[in-house]
Amino acid sequence: MNCDPIYELALPGVQQLIPYKAGKPIEELERELGLTNIIKLASNENPLGPSPLAIAAIQGTLKDLALYPDGNGFNLKQALSSKFNIDVRQITLGNGSNELLELIARTFVSPEHEVVFSRHAFAVYPIVTQAVGAKAVIVPARQYGYDLDAIRLAISDKTRVVFIANPNNPTGTLLAGNELESFISDLPKTVICVLDEAYFEFIAPEHQANSLEWLDRYPNLIITRTFSKAYGLAGLRIGFGCSSALIADLLNRVRQPFNNNMLALAAAEAALNDHAHLQKTVLNNQQGMGQLLDGFRKLKLDWIPSAGNFVSVDLRQSGEAIYQALLLKGVIVRPVANYEMPHHLRISIGTQAENQIFLDALEAILAHV
C-alpha cells in the first residue's frame, strides 16, 4: 500500500488499477538483447502493413499539419455511413476503439453501478470499469468464450453496461449471430450492451452477424470497430462506434476535441475504400492460420479455435517460460497469464515467412524442455 499523500489523492478505482501491458515493442527487445531481424507476432497487427492508398492519403495531408484536424471527422463519417448504410449521426470516432470503451464508461457508469463481462475478456474492460469506480462482475467462461446464459443471470438492478467481444480477444471464440441477438433482445433497456467487433473483418463471411442492422431495433446497443487490425493503421489510433443517434450525441459530449489527428482521418478514409488490400489481408490471415494450425498438429499441441487474426496455443507448461525462450530467438508473442491462461501463448498471424520462423523456434525450444 502506497502511503504517499499524493497517491492518496487519486480515486480509489485508479489506485487499484493494474495498468494495461501491451505487447513488447521490437525496439525494446533490440535494446535489451542487441538482436536484429526480430519478428513480432504479439499485438494482432496487420503483417501486410497499411493500404497503399492510406499511405498516399497521409502524404497528401502532410502539408496541412499546422492546422487542426476536422474535429467532427466529417469525411470519414460520410465514408463510414456510405459503406455500412448507417446515418452519420450514429457514428462516434475514437482514438482507437479503446477510447470508445472509455467514453462509454465515463458517459454511463458511476461508482454505484456494475459492469458485466466474461472471464478471459479483453483487459481494457476492467480498466475502464475500475477507472470510474464501478464494480466489475466477471462471469465464468464457457470453453474460453462467453456464456450468455451465465451473463443473463449476472445482470442486476445495478448493471449499467455489458461488454461482449465477438470474436473475443485473446481466445478468438465466436458467438453465433442469432444467439447474440437473442441475448441483446432480452437485456433490460437500462443496460447498455457494447459489442466489441475489433476483429470483425476476419470472421468468415458465412459467420458474420448483421450486427449493424440491429441498431434500429435495440437503442441500448453500441458496436465498436477499429482500423488497427484488418486495416493496418494501429500506429495512427483510430476506431469508430455505431449506436443510436442519441447515444452518439452523449458520447460526443465527453469526447475530447480533435481526438483524431488529420493523418489518421485521411488514412482511415482511404483504407476503408481499398477493398483489394482488405481482401489480401483476409486471405493472408486464412492461409497463415492454416499454416500455424498445421504446425501445432505436428508438435501435438492443442489450441483454441479462433475467428480472429490470432490463435492461443496450449503449451501444457508455463507459457511465460516459453515466451522468454522465444524472445532469446528474436520472436515476440503474447503471454496471456494475466487472462488466467498461464499455459497458453497468443500468436498473431504473420506473413508465411514470419509464421515459419516462429514455428521453427517453438519446435526447437520444445525439443529441449
Language-model segments: which ranges?
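N-terminal "arm"/small-domain region of PLP-dependent enzymes with the aminotransferase-like
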Residues: 2-67
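Short acidic capping loops at alpha-helix termini that bridge into adjacent secondary structure
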Residues: 37, 87-91, 111-114, 158, ...
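PLP-dependent aminotransferase class I/II
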Residues: 51, 72, 220-304
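Phosphate-binding glycine-rich loop
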Residues: 66-114, 132
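PLP-dependent aminotransferase-like
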Residues: 107-164
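Active-site pre-lysine segment of PLP-dependent enzymes
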Residues: 148-158, 170-193, 197-228
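Conserved PLP-binding catalytic core of the aspartate aminotransferase-like
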Residues: 286, 295-329
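PLP-dependent enzyme catalytic core of the Aspartate aminotransferase-like
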Residues: 325-329, 333-334, 338-369
